Amino acid sequence: MRTYDDTFSGQRIYPGKGKLYVRGDSKIFRFQNGKSESLFLQRKNPRRIAWTVLYRRQHKKGISEEVAKKRSRRTVKAQRAIVGASLEVIKERRSMRPEARSAARLAAIKESKAKKQETQAAKKAEKAKNAANPKARVTSKQGAKGAPVKVAAKSR
């Protein structure tokens, strides 16, 4: 047996009962009785009429079975290794004292600064070596092809 739901009240409509209302835009509405049809045509909001299914759902009426609230699962933080550091290394760093950590940090900074200075010194030495023996002047491609050399103006 096929049943339909009332579009206004949400109640069940059994075969041979109710009315079918077709709007101008071809949307079909099914009403269980004249009461729900009348309220629909008056453009009443079913969420504000106490006996409709929509109102009862919105105001949590008649749901006595769900007394116990649903418990949500608590999220638990899990430590995972990341690229470049295993879990043991991470745990070791976490357990270090702040003083030891700052000392290790300063040592690492000092080491990186020394390395940087070293590379800069090497660059400077390379530059000085290149400046000591200059290469021949760079000639333009046009000149090499035999283009006439532009003579500087002497009248001024």
UniProtKB/Swiss-Prot annotation:
Keyword field contains Zinc-finger: no
Domain of life: Eukaryota
InterPro entries: L24e/L24_sf, Ribosomal_eL24, Ribosomal_eL24-rel_N, Ribosomal_eL24_CS
Chief site of localization: cytoplasm
CDD domains reported for this sequence: Ribosomal_L24e_L24 (cd00472)
Localization annotation: Cytoplasm
Keywords (A to Z) from UniProt: Cytoplasm, Ribonucleoprotein, Ribosomal protein
Paired cysteines (S-S): none
Gene Ontology CC annotations of this record: cytosolic large ribosomal subunit
Gene Ontology molecular function: any one: mRNA binding
UniProt key word Iron: no
UniProt biased composition (Basic and acidic residues): 110-129
Region (Disordered): 110-156
Biased composition, class Low complexity, residue ranges: 130-156
GO BP annotation list: cytoplasmic translation
Oligomer and partners: Component of the large ribosomal subunit (LSU). Mature N.crassa ribosomes consist of a small (40S) and a large (60S) subunit. The 40S small subunit contains 1 molecule of ribosomal RNA (18S rRNA) and at least 32 different proteins. The large 60S subunit contains 3 rRNA molecules (26S, 5.8S and 5S rRNA) and at least 42 different proteins.
Protein purpose: Component of the ribosome, a large ribonucleoprotein complex responsible for the synthesis of proteins in the cell. The small ribosomal subunit (SSU) binds messenger RNAs (mRNAs) and translates the encoded message by selecting cognate aminoacyl-transfer RNA (tRNA) molecules. The large subunit (LSU) contains the ribosomal catalytic site termed the peptidyl transferase center (PTC), which catalyzes the formation of peptide bonds, thereby polymerizing the amino acids delivered by tRNAs into a polypeptide chain.
Record family assignment: Belongs to the eukaryotic ribosomal protein eL24 family.
Protein's recorded name: Large ribosomal subunit protein eL24
Species of origin: Neurospora crassa (strain ATCC 24698 / 74-OR23-1A / CBS 708.71 / DSM 1257 / FGSC 987)
Primary gene name: rpl-24
